[in-house]
Amino acid sequence: MRNPSISITPEGLPAIGLCTLATLTFALIGCWVMAVIFLLLTWFCCHFFRDPERVTPTGAGLAVSPADGRVIRVEPVTDPITGEKRTCVCIFMNVFNVHVNRMPVAGTIRNIVYHPGKFFNAAWDKAATDNERCDYLIEDAEGGKWTMVQIAGLIARRIVCRVDEGDTLTRGERYGMIRFGSRVDLYLPDGYCPTVSVGEHVFAGQTIVARKSPEGA
């Protein structure tokens, strides 16, 4: 169950402020068509930049979704940082999803690599290698290595990273966002098995997407 408490992410305040100012300005001069248009834009920006609180599951040996959206792929893929073949859980965010990204596990950010690139549809396979993206290598308390990739999409034109290498964060903690539709890939370390399948809708910091297998415990 999602927590009803909702705030606005700081990245959205400039856009919301400008749209609100434009709405008031056009209303004061009697240009009601433009006032309504900017009122709708203000609502859209508030909706897009919403940042609801989430109840993150507790317990050992589990990972939560790093993003809101729909699972579009769960399959072995070459990890862009380690070069190893790992199970990847791919989550696609449309423009109506919450776009704040959260940590899948508690751990330390060991490496951050930004790649400038193109802006193909984030659901396409080639988006993982050709699009603008940001790779994160996370080390958990047991030494497990997790790779997380923010991928900009067709409309998304800015990846926001709020962390630095060496930062230690908790499971479900906010680490960044991507604006206006995008994708996040999570590469699982050995010993973890996915708990979601293609087509499922997940929520950042809340939906369990992987668990440690009995053999890996």
From Swiss-Prot:
Its cofactor is pyruvate. InterPro entries: PS_Dcarbxylase, PSD-A. It is found in: Cell membrane. GO terms for biological process: phosphatidylethanolamine biosynthetic process. It is a peripheral membrane protein. Its EC number is 4.1.1.65. The active site is at residue 182. It catalyses: a 1,2-diacyl-sn-glycero-3-phospho-L-serine + H(+) = a 1,2-diacyl-sn-glycero-3-phosphoethanolamine + CO2. Pathway: Phospholipid metabolism; phosphatidylethanolamine biosynthesis; phosphatidylethanolamine from CDP-diacylglycerol: step 2/2. It comes from the Bacteria. Belongs to the phosphatidylserine decarboxylase family. PSD-A subfamily. Catalyzes the formation of phosphatidylethanolamine (PtdEtn) from phosphatidylserine (PtdSer). Heterodimer of a large membrane-associated beta subunit and a small pyruvoyl-containing alpha subunit. This is Phosphatidylserine decarboxylase proenzyme.
